[in-house]
Amino acid sequence: MILKAGPNFSMPGPDRDAGVTQIIWRHGKRNLALRAAGLMPIICPIADGSGVCGVSVFDATPEDVERIMALDPGVQAGVFTFDIHPTRSFPGSCLPASDAGSLTI
């Protein structure tokens, strides 16, 4: 799933609406709960100003991902939009345990 900036998105900084900041915190907490439940094992925030805000890998059908993301507080508030791209992986694929800050997509 590719998370993108929605019409109500704003970059972090002193001019960001406090309501947007709260929505993004709720979105992040929800993502961590989805990870803990095994539904979204890989979460990759992107903050390069490109309009792409993140990439996540779900362990769910595209239909289930659509339902899950439709309930996301950031999506509901128009802060984010998303695209679903069904994919597959190789058994055992995972992120390295080393410094996650060095990964590039």
Where are these regions (language model features)?
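Conserved, structured core segments of small domains
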Residues: M1-I105
